[in-house]
Amino acid sequence: MHPGWLSNAYLVADRPGGTGVFVDSGAPLEPLLRSVEERELTVTHLLVTHGHGDHTAGNELLRRRFGLETVERPRDPFQTGGLTIEVLPTPGHSNDSLSFLVNGNVCFSGDVLFAGSVGGSSSSYADLRRSIMEVLLTLPPETRLLPGHTDETSVGREWQQNPFVRVWRGLDPEGEERCSVGGRGARLVLWARDYDGGFKALVRFDDDGDQVVGGSRVERQL
């Protein structure tokens, strides 16, 4: 994990001496490179969850070193070694956001869904909500979720405990507090902890629907 960005980079392999893939490259790569050598892996692909710099910083280094095939657009499921990889379009945080389901039981969710939080709706709130509720959280509850930042979680845990999901499911009430974001009036539907220890907010603008934004952008009217 990157000490500043808190972003993750992953190495997934089928077995020692077998085949592996990288997922994102925004964290320090030395531990992953060391694992490739120690486990004598043949790495074939670089899976890119989205194009933001805190997830792509090491892409060129990895491509040059290993001659990797890069997966950064939707495509049919494919197999490399003993790994079967499904590419799930999950836009909302960014238009190009992808999640990757490996061997049917581990999903790399990028910046769409975190442990206890969700990504900012930088490109489309409707797409973000749909990607979470109709794609990621329809996977089996035991599916491991490895997000783009900080801690691992699971589909079942986020379905039951994620505060954004609970509001979307109608399990918890929406807030009524007034606030503003960038000078625009809004209602603060939800104020919740984010992956970095700060806050994230679901706001309903008076003039333009819902958005998920970083808490630092919200002026609360307490």
Name the predicted role of every residue range.
Residues M1-R39, S99-G110, G116:
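Conserved beta-strand hairpin/beta-sheet module of binuclear metal-dependent hydrolase folds
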Residues L11, P77-V102, C107:
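Core dinuclear metal-dependent hydrolase active-site scaffold
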Residues L29-E72:
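Active-site metal-binding motif and surrounding structural segment of the metallo-beta-lactamase
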Residues G20, L46, T84, V106-C107, ...:
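Hydrophobic "anchor" residues on beta-strands that sit immediately upstream
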Residues R130-R144, T150-L222:
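Accessory terminal helices/loops
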Residues L46-T56, L88-S97, L145-E152:
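Histidine-centered catalytic micro-motifs
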Residues A115-S122:
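A short acidic, helix-capping loop that chelates divalent metal ions and anchors anionic groups
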Residues V12, D24, H50, L62, ...:
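Divalent metal-coordination and catalytic microenvironments
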